[in-house]
Amino acid sequence: MEERMITPQQLPGDQEGEVLRPHRLADYIGQTKVKDNLQIFIQAALARGEALDHVLLYGPPGLGKTTLANIIATEMEVNIRTTSGPAIERPGDLAAILTSLEPRDVLFIDEIHRLSRTTEEILYSAMEDGCLDIVIGKGPSARSIRLTLPPFTLVGATTRAGQLASPLRDRFGVISRLEFYEVEDLIRIITRAAGILNLQITLEGASEIARRSRGTPRVANRLLKRVRDYAQVWEDGRVTQELAGKSLDRLEVDPAGLDRIDQKCLLTIIQMFAGGPVGLETLSATIGEEAETIEDVVEPYLLQQGFIQRTPRGRVATVRAYQHLNIPVNSSHQEGGQGDSLFDAAED
């Protein structure tokens, strides 16, 4: 898949945005319910001198799960060890990490749903009993020893909570879903980032970027940095609404935050399948994108904004999608669509 300016996934240039990350809950904007609950749990754990209970953060990418994990460690005044599901290839890799933790440390596992089942099972006793069972030797002479681990906090992050095994999910004491951000919160995030970058920006300019940021802080910060480039070359370095709008149009991010891939997806459903329904695999083959990419990256925002609906027979474009693309709503769409493929019967 081509690199998208508005993808919520992390891009190579986003590492420069680490300076924009908040380091305390007081500086973290948005996700009020999640933040307020974590504040209570952290204060209580500190008062008791205990490790914070294990935390599962789930939701679409780019909403601040990694940032929250680091904030938890900072607020708890402990170290954080960061890894990811794909990086832990063998159970021994996870065992080595667990035995290296200091008391009350935070272990952050991104994409925790991608842990292998055998590796995942090591976490069961570690999370619940604070122990690690290790088998030494092979065959009849093999023996099992139990190591006691220091109290620690596992923070797991995932975009696919449904793929976690129930025994693992049930061992998290705190489970929080991160939602797409409201425009007002994104304006505050953009204004804060502009201050850190020593960039002059008007409220209207911040609003224009926020509206096109797909409810995602990572996208907002990325677009802000690109608009800054246009402001320095085209103008006097100050970001106004007009400058932001022209810059984002140039980047092919429309006023609703849709890019060429989003529009291609909607146009395919409308023009080739009479508005739908169309199954995921058929849509994937038609537009030339992987089904997983459509499901994880493209669809969440289109669903959240009401441009498509998912039905038992497949994806359907809504009236709002027609209106946004300036396409007349046809009778087949109003009747529920007749454009499903022969392949769609077995598809979601």
UniProtKB/Swiss-Prot annotation:
Question: Where along this sequence does the record place binding of DNA?
Answer: R310, R315
Q: Which GO terms describe its molecular function?
A: ATP binding; ATP hydrolysis activity; four-way junction DNA binding; four-way junction helicase activity
Asked if the record carries the keyword DNA repair, the reply is: yes
Give the location in the cell. Answer: Cytoplasm
Any idea which UniProt keywords this protein has? ATP-binding, Cytoplasm, DNA damage, DNA recombination, DNA repair, DNA-binding, Hydrolase, Nucleotide-binding
GO biological process terms on file: DNA recombination; DNA repair
The primary site where this protein sits is: cytoplasm
Query: Where is Mg(2+) bound in this sequence?
Result: T66
| Presence of the UniProt keyword Transmembrane helix in the record | no
Region span, Disordered: 329-348
Ranges for region Large ATPase domain (RuvB-L)? 1-181
Q: What are the binding positions for ATP in this chain?
A: L20, R21, G62, K65, T66, T67, R171, Y181, R218
Q: Which Gene Ontology terms of cellular component type are present?
A: cytoplasm; Holliday junction resolvase complex
Which Gene3D superfamilies does the record match to this protein? 1.10.8.60, P-loop containing nucleotide triphosphate hydrolases, Winged helix-like DNA-binding domain superfamily/Winged helix DNA-binding domain
**Region spans: Small ATPAse domain (RuvB-S):** 182-252
The reaction(s) annotated as catalysed by this protein in its Swiss-Prot or TrEMBL entry are: ATP + H2O = ADP + phosphate + H(+)
Record family assignment = Belongs to the RuvB family.
Subunit and interaction comment: Homohexamer. Forms an RuvA(8)-RuvB(12)-Holliday junction (HJ) complex. HJ DNA is sandwiched between 2 RuvA tetramers; dsDNA enters through RuvA and exits via RuvB. An RuvB hexamer assembles on each DNA strand where it exits the tetramer. Each RuvB hexamer is contacted by two RuvA subunits (via domain III) on 2 adjacent RuvB subunits; this complex drives branch migration. In the full resolvosome a probable DNA-RuvA(4)-RuvB(12)-RuvC(2) complex forms which resolves the HJ.
Under the heading PANTHER family, the entry gives: HOLLIDAY JUNCTION BRANCH MIGRATION COMPLEX SUBUNIT RUVB, PTHR42848
Function text: The RuvA-RuvB-RuvC complex processes Holliday junction (HJ) DNA during genetic recombination and DNA repair, while the RuvA-RuvB complex plays an important role in the rescue of blocked DNA replication forks via replication fork reversal (RFR). RuvA specifically binds to HJ cruciform DNA, conferring on it an open structure. The RuvB hexamer acts as an ATP-dependent pump, pulling dsDNA into and through the RuvAB complex. RuvB forms 2 homohexamers on either side of HJ DNA bound by 1 or 2 RuvA tetramers; 4 subunits per hexamer contact DNA at a time.
Q: What is known of its domains?
A: Has 3 domains, the large (RuvB-L) and small ATPase (RuvB-S) domains and the C-terminal head (RuvB-H) domain. The head domain binds DNA, while the ATPase domains jointly bind ATP, ADP or are empty depending on the state of the subunit in the translocation cycle. During a single DNA translocation step the structure of each domain remains the same, but their relative positions change.
Q: What is this protein called?
A: Holliday junction branch migration complex subunit RuvB
Lineage per the UniProt record = Bacteria, Bacillati, Bacillota, Clostridia, Eubacteriales
What's the name of its gene?
ruvB
